């Protein structure tokens, strides 16, 4: 980003002022930068509301993507066996999935299962930036095409609890109607107006860009060395 290159300019100036030897390496990389994200929640008989959200690195884009919101209850069950995992992902097809699972493996398997999108809950009420890539950084040429680019956002803990309760209430109402033998006559959950629907809007800047990185060298008395590395970028202030 422009801010990232400005940070490199600053570091280079400081290195020069200190008389430290350095090289500024230029390269091209596949950059994924979240731009904007929101989740609008809809349920018959209740006013629509928008949940504050942030997209993850390597999320796909979504523009008015709408689908039934389902709660991934299995994400709270700990380690699952193969059959349990199959049953879990079978329920995701054509749905927007609400979950606490923020792993890349889950994201990848949810995409394979036909999920429309993922709304992940970060347990705390502070935004947590994440990546839906296999590593932090640019994917290798072999990995890049494996990324599903499924629309993915994270929401705050308190909003997640609210959505979980809404989805559970809708599912409980469906169970009651089914017990009365009404389900067959009325059709799907959505037809009864019991389903919670989510609309995902995600804007991303996923493209190849030119970037640079400073590498400073402070020589010692022997060929042995200590490699120090760290982030100089920041999502907000830094």
Describe the residue ranges of each PLM region:
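Structured segments of extracytoplasmic/periplasmic soluble domains
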Residues: 10-21, 100, 109, 113, ...
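Stable alpha-helical elements in mature extracytoplasmic
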Residues: 3-14, 103-106, 111, 159-163, ...
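Generic beta-strand/beta-sheet core signal
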Residues: 25, 121, 229-231
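Molybdopterin (Moco) oxidoreductase catalytic core of the xanthine/aldehyde oxidoreductase family
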Residues: 121-145
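Soluble metallo-hydrolase cores and metallopeptidase-like ectodomains found primarily
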Residues: 50-83, 140-179, 185-238
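Extracytoplasmic/secreted cell-surface and envelope-processing proteins
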Residues: 8, 32-36, 105-109, 126-135, ...
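A conserved hydrophobic secondary-structure block that centers on an alpha-helix together
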Residues: 74-130
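Noncatalytic luminal/extracellular "stalk/propeptide" segments of secretory-pathway proteins
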Residues: 1-96
């Amino acid at each position: 980003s422009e801010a990232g290159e400005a940070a490199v300019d600053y570091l280079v100036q400081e290195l020069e002022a200190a008389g430290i030897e350095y090289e500024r390496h230029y390269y091209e990389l596949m950059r994924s930068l979240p731009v904007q994200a929101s989740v609008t929640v809809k349920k018959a008989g209740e006013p629509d509301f928008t949940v504050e959200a942030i997209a993850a690195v390597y999320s796909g884009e979504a523009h008015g993507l709408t689908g039934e919101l389902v709660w991934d209850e299995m994400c709270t069950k700990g380690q699952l066996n193969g059959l349990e995992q199959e049953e879990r992902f079978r329920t995701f097809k054509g749905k927007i999935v609400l979950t606490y699972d923020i792993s890349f493996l889950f994201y990848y398997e949810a995409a394979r299962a036909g999920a429309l999108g993922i709304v992940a809950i970060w347990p705390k009420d502070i935004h947590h930036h994440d990546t839906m890539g296999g590593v932090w950084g640019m994917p290798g040429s072999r990995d890049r095409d494996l990324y599903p680019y499924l629309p993915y956002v994270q929401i705050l803990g308190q909003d997640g609890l609210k959505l979980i309760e809404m989805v559970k209430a809708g599912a409980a109402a469906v169970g009651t109607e089914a017990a009365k033998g009404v389900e067959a006559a009325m059709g799907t959950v959505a037809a009864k107006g019991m389903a919670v629907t989510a609309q995902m809007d995600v804007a991303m800047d996923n493209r190849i860009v030119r970037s640079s990185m400073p590498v400073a060298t402070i020589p010692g008395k022997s060929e042995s060395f200590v490699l120090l590395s760290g982030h100089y970028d920041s999502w907000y202030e830094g």
